[in-house]
Structure formats: structure tokens, C-alpha cells
Curated annotation (Swiss-Prot):
Enzyme class name: translocase
Cysteines engaged in disulfide bonds, as pairs: none
The protein's name: Aliphatic sulfonates import ATP-binding protein SsuB
Family: Belongs to the ABC transporter superfamily. Aliphatic sulfonates importer (TC 3.A.1.17.2) family.
Cell compartment(s), UniProt: Cell membrane
Database matches in PANTHER family: ALIPHATIC SULFONATES IMPORT ATP-BINDING PROTEIN SSUB, TAURINE IMPORT ATP-BINDING PROTEIN-RELATED
Chief site of localization: membrane
Length: 302
């Protein structure tokens, strides 16, 4: 059965995610109690919104779309006189892993924010599965809340704690339920963010450069973990990255976003296990780098 989708993601938000449309990158602890309360409420709302982006309110039209997790037609988003997304068309099938490449400012993160319900002011048709989660480059954990509570934020039911423990075990953090976020490494914090996304059993997971701030060895480990989790849970994945090799290693299909539209859409026809020494890998890398306007000698920048 095709998944049910919903239209016009920017129309309304669930009461659990009200007043948290923008991200809080860094929070400095205020000096006064009133300021503390205000900042805590904002950070809590932001983490809640990150965890529960899939709970955008229903509109009148809800329908299937031939097994698609995402279907976008003519999406346009402008900021003042600047057009970021210009008539974008995109379909992502249920269970498909799609990587999205593009230069800085090409609209990749804007697209993720629209699909996650963080950004409005759009025109065009945007459909996405009702159960969806977002993982950002920053883990966005509440620093004054223990790991398990960060994973289960916004959930209810008698089995919530057990579901959270299972999710943490899946990402290799069994026994860390009572750890404070400050005690976690960067890789561990991103594992918690993955657990928080997957504990909701989403049909669609969107990842916006989730491993960009990690060291090379940790990135390799996170690649293996993400592949394992995707095989187990089978969500559709929209994965934003600047790393061409990362896109080829992980995805079924790679897209390039240029000036608000998809300029390239190619399948990853590279045998598994994928190796950078494979001629097919090298050919696809060259194609993608050329589309991005990057000299292969500078590919490390991507």
C-alpha cells in the first residue's frame, strides 16, 4: 500500500511544535532567572520541533502518491528578491536513499527545512509522508536533559522509556541512557540524534550534513551505522552533503541542485561493497564534480 502523504507542509503546525520555526545553533546560559526561563523554553521548543518535525498538521487533502515518500512539483521559495528554489521538481520513492549535492547557497538546507515543516512562504506542491524526522549537522540535544530523555522528547505512552533504550542500543549507546550530553563525543551526540529520529519509526528521514563536523574515522563509522540502520528500518532518506565520495558510498541516487533546480539526477551504478578504486566510482565522481564546477584536484574540499 502506498504511504499516505500530506500537502502544503507550511500551512499549520502541531501544538507540540508551535513557535519553533527557526533553529537555535548555540545557547548561552543567561544570567537572570527570567532570561533563563525564556531561553530554556526556546531551546526546548526547538529540540521538540527537531524531534517532531513529522507532526505537521493535516490539511484537507491527504492522498497516496504511487509509493513516493516525497513528491514536489514547482516548488518556489524566495527571500526578498533572492530566489533560492526556483520551480523545483523532485520525487523520492519509499525506501530510497537519495543524496543531494550542491554548492553553498544552492538551496539544499532550505529544502530540508521546508520538508521538515520549519520553513513556510512557499509556492508549488509539496507532498511528504506524515511520519518524518530530521537530523542536522548539530545534534541539538538539550544540555540539561539526560540522553534517554533527549531521545524520547515529545513521545508518550507506557513503553516510551523502553523504546528509547532500544533505539540507543541500536546506535551503539546501550548503557548511556543517563549520560549528560556534555559527556558525549561529537560522534556519540550524532548517534543520539539518529536514535531520536528512528525511535519514531519514520517513513522518511532527512539528514542535513549530519557528519560534516566529525573527524574522518568517526565519519567512516557513522557511514556504516547509517547503512545498517537503513537496512533495518527501510525509511526513505534524503541526505544532504558536500562530500561527493560520501554521496556515492551511501546513496541509491545522487542529485545536484544548481540555482534552485535539479541540474543532475543519476543512479549510483557502482557494485557493492563500493570502493573508491572502482572505475565506476571514479567515473561517477568525475561526472558529479564536473556538474558542481569543481576541479578534481580540489575534490577534498567537497
Amino acid at each position: 500500500m502506498a504511504p499516505r502523504l500530506r500537502r502544503n507542509l507550511s500551512t499549520d503546525t502541531d501544538t507540540n511544535t508551535t513557535a519553533a520555526a527557526t533553529a537555535v545553533a548555540t545557547l548561552e546560559r543567561p544570567a537572570t532567572a527570567d532570561a533563563q526561563h525564556t531561553a530554556d523554553a526556546q531551546h526546548t521548543a526547538d529540540a521538540q520541533h527537531t524531534a517532531d518535525a513529522q507532526h505537521t498538521a493535516e490539511t484537507a487533502e491527504t492522498r497516496g502518491a504511487d509509493g513516493a515518500a516525497i513528491r514536489i512539483r514547482g516548488l518556489r521559495r524566495t527571500f526578498g528578491n533572492h530566489t533560492v528554489l526556483d520551480g523545483l521538481d523532485l520525487t523520492v520513492a519509499s525506501g530510497e536513499f537519495v543524496a543531494l549535492l550542491g554548492r553553498s547557497g544552492s538551496g539544499k538546507s532550505t529544502l530540508i527545512r521546508i520538508l521538515g515543516g520549519f520553513d513556510g512562504g512557499i509556492s508549488g506542491e509539496v507532498l511528504a509522508t506524515r511520519q518524518r524526522s530530521v537530523v542536522f549537522q548539530e545534534a541539538r540535544l538539550l544540555p540539561w536533559t539526560r540522553t534517554l530523555a533527549n531521545v524520547t522528547i515529545g513521545l508518550s505512552g507506557r513503553d516510551v522509556a523502553e523504546r528509547g533504550r532500544v533505539a540507543l542500543a541500536e546506535v551503539g549507546l546501550a548503557g548511556r541512557e543517563r549520560s549528560w550530553p556534555v559527556a558525549l563525543s561529537g560522534g556519540e551526540a550524532q548517534r543520539v540524534a539518529l536514535a531520536r529520529a528512528l525511535v519514531r519509526e519514520p517513513d522518511l528521514v532527512m539528514l542535513d550534513e549530519p557528519f560534516g563536523a566529525l573527524d574522518a574515522l568517526t565519519r567512516i563509522r557513522m557511514h556504516a551505522l547509517l547503512q545498517q540502520l537503513c537496512r533495518r528500518h527501510r525509511p526513505a532518506v534524503l541526505f544532504v552533503t558536500h562530500d561527493v565520495d560520501e554521496a556515492i558510498l551511501l546513496a541509491d541516487r545522487v542529485l545536484v541542485l544548481t540555482e534552485g533546480r535539479l541540474s543532475l539526477d543519476v543512479p549510483v551504478d557502482v557494485a557493492s561493497p563500493r570502493r573508491r578504486t572502482d572505475p565506476a566510482f571514479d567515473r561517477l565522481r568525475s561526472t558529479l564534480l564536473a556538474e558542481l564546477g569543481v576541479d578534481e584536484l580540489a575534490e577534498g574540499d567537497h
